[in-house]
Amino acid sequence: MDKLRVLYDEFVTISKDNLERETGLSASDVDMDFDLNIFMTLVPVLEKKVCVITPTIEDDKIVTMMKYCSYQSFSFWFLKSGAVVKSVYNKLDDAEKEKFVATFKDMLLNVQTLISLNSMYTRLRQDTEDIVSDSKKIMEIVSHLRASTTENAAYQVLQQNNSFIISTLNKILSDENYLLKIIAVFDSKLISEKETLNEYKQLYTISSESLVYGIRCVSNLDISSVQLSNNKYVLFVKKMLPKIILFQNNDINAQQFANVISKIYTLIYRQLTSNVDVGCLLTDTIESTKTKISVEKFKQTGINNVQSLIKFISDNKKEYKTIISEEYLSKEDRIITILQNIVNEHDIKYDNNLLNMRDLIVTFRERYSYKF
């Protein structure tokens, strides 16, 4: 919103100066909210008349769009004259034209984002009731699983809730904003503050394309040295995954994915319970973090459920992002060494090549760390 405000101010300043000079009329007071509503109505019309607005749109298309934008719709020039944005553009020198086109283009792109946020904002409010209901059902299933004393009893719980689990997974995997909606249930700021919604959208929106790519990458891991555990949980997952629409529509081998996930789970459990280096790393991290996090602050806040915990983290996210970042960066080399040793020991390959954990982690950090 701050960027849009700057772009809007630039657009208004250039427009007012030229309109007043050319007509001899004085501009009216500026009402940004009023004008943004006009732009939000205008953008779909411009896209229908000219073309879809994208970051790669050509400048001549932007200039064409200027012909359809009449200043008399905006607060600062309301009903004063029939001048269009292109008439101001025509009066500028080449350098000013280039800057004006860039400003107008970026403003339209930001308005487009605002339209998307408004739509998501409305859907968030509508969908939270369903998500609350789903969340309660999920917690109920988890509670029954924890209370199960045998593998057969746990399997029965999963079987009894098979339809709900499949329908919920299909819902989650078909909606790139589902994770965002779950957070909105616990953090009301997403409903009341659009800037917070935009910030969280950058973090927690996961596209179907990204999911499919990630699933394929995991499926293609070669972890043949780890024995497959065909327990009842794995069998349940194997029966369930082929019914997931994302797997059906993208021709993903559900059995292969389930096998790899089972092996990864087995490997992680084994490392957490028997790898001395992993144990030392976790202990050192916990001890180091204790010196940076105030236990008293937790107590004073009165955190007693998931909702209050998420709200606390949201209110203090800048502080905790800094702590996590410092902890990770100070231990990155150690983490990479431990992971590479595990890869080497178990001969874990991707595309017939041994995984290079340093390349993988550094690439991920460079591409995606800005999100966190």
Curated annotation (Swiss-Prot):
Pfam family, one: Pox_A6
Annotated Gene Ontology cellular component terms: host cell cytoplasm; virion component
InterPro entries linked: Poxvirus_A6 (IPR007008)
Keywords: Host cytoplasm, Virion
Compartments it resides in: Host cytoplasm; Virion
Main location class: host cell
Functional note: Lipid-bound viral membrane assembly protein that plays an essential role in immature virion (IV) to mature virion (MV) transition. Functions in both crescent-shaped viral membranes formation and its enclosure to form immature virions. In addition, participates in targeting mature virion proteins to sites of virion assembly to ensure their correct localization.
Entry note about domains: The N-terminal domain is not required for crescent formation but is required for virion formation.
Family indicated by similarity: Belongs to the orthopoxvirus OPG132 family.
Designated name of the protein: Virion morphogenesis protein OPG132
Organism: Variola virus (isolate Human/India/Ind3/1967) (VARV)
